[in-house]
């Protein structure tokens, strides 16, 4: 029986991060193997802001999610920032338990011209936000989608979940492009919608519990990217998501993910709960950043049951020099040692 390797901290890295003490060989994430051609780098798309959304982490996450699988499935879809910024997979599934979010994406896919026209005619107005925040069960699906987008894009926080009548994002002195900064951002968000319409044409949508979707679409050719609500111990606010998860629900999710045939990647803040649930999976850490909800530092991490360092799985992406990530390989992998290439 081999004796465990005794590691010692080597101090901060050149970008200020502390190296990780780990049970396997300590290494830097090899970004050179993942640098793609300049023509492969795509402009980033975003439909709306979302608490816990991964738009700001695209440079970190996309190189770690293999593009070789036949099916890409997001059980916790949220703003779909990961899905719409990936190259299309042969089969793609988006799921979210919030029917307002799924209704918006379905409407913009199936009624894109009409919805974009209505949104473009919507003034940047406090009254529009007030109207959008008041539920009316008799609304059409398209009008529901328009009001959802208004809530998401005209609120002060810029997050769909935290919109309210008193949070209209008006400006006093800030200007941009010859107009109030908030108005400019609103118009810019509308201009970006046609690209998103085109990208969503090939996506199938679900509005169901995440575990139900995982079991339904599990196969050896499926890559699940799971971005569940951050555990409560890793953040300061307790009601940031429309649908929260308890620690027990996180445990149930981990039990299911450990039993699937497919490859799995799980996003989250590092905390004792996540480290315990995915202790024998590979973990990659992003640079430490400030967490607004707790006014402290939080480390965004990705846990995988496959080896994300394999260059054949992540061709076409590049890591920028400013994003150097820590890579931790445990002594043993989880239920799956390497992602299998779909046939």
Give a label for each model feature.
Residues 28-57, 67, 109-239, 252-255, ...:
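SAM-dependent nucleic-acid methyltransferase catalytic core
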Residues 308-342:
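Flexible, glycine-/basic-rich loop-and-beta segments that form/coincide
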Residues 76-81, 192, 268-272:
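Short, polar loop motifs at secondary-structure junctions
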Residues 1-39:
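Short Pro-Cys-Gly-centered "Cys-loop" motif that presents a nucleophilic cysteine in a tight turn
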Residues 150, 302-305:
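Short, well-ordered beta-strand micro-motif
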